Amino acid sequence: MYYVIASLLGYIFGCIHGSQIVGKLKGINIKDGGVKNAGASNTTILLGWKYGIVVALIDIFKATAAIFLLLILLQGNAIPTQEQHIYIYLTALFVIIGHNYPITMQFSGGKGTASLVGALIAIDWRIALIGIGVLILFTIATDYLAVGVLSMYISFLITTYYIFGLAPFFIVVGLSVLSIYKHIENYKRIIGKEETKLSSMFGKKAS
């Protein structure tokens, strides 16, 4: 029963899209321009960093809120701690599936980076601190967000295994494969020196 609740809860929250909300307010479809992706980075490319931050905050908050709501639902049900961890990670997985493949956007969404950050915050402060730190470090060092995201997933795999064990680790493996698949075009553009750099994104003024 709780597997279904965690999955549905995650997917429903995942379908709340920051880029869709901002896009409607600005009268544009974020997926129609830039790198054709419904996420914070493409919003930054099209509308400037202020709108990109708004989208990122919405997508971060929805993941954190979904996991916190799950924890409230689990309270008082005498569920073993290890089992709770699986439900938490399952919720995180489906938030990102909902973000990447939202029914509200004909199953064509973003890449789940901001939502993963929100999930890390809700899962464990140590995992969040290391993961976000790695994301920032490698993104700034390479000037490519996609490299920072890949590094964050690697850190998430390692910290999950050491803190929560094998079952949640396998869920993160699934998340990592999904992220790599969603970022394949970014990696191709990086190799071809065609990827938009982080520094150029934040050089764009909000419109």
UniProtKB/Swiss-Prot annotation:
Pathway: Lipid metabolism; phospholipid metabolism. InterPro entries: G3P_acylTferase_PlsY. GO terms for molecular function: acyl-phosphate glycerol-3-phosphate acyltransferase activity. Keywords: Cell membrane, Lipid biosynthesis, Lipid metabolism, Membrane, Phospholipid biosynthesis, Phospholipid metabolism, Transferase, Transmembrane, Transmembrane helix. Pfam families: G3P_acyltransf. It catalyses: an acyl phosphate + sn-glycerol 3-phosphate = a 1-acyl-sn-glycero-3-phosphate + phosphate. This is Glycerol-3-phosphate acyltransferase 1. It comes from Oceanobacillus iheyensis (strain DSM 14371 / CIP 107618 / JCM 11309 / KCTC 3954 / HTE831).
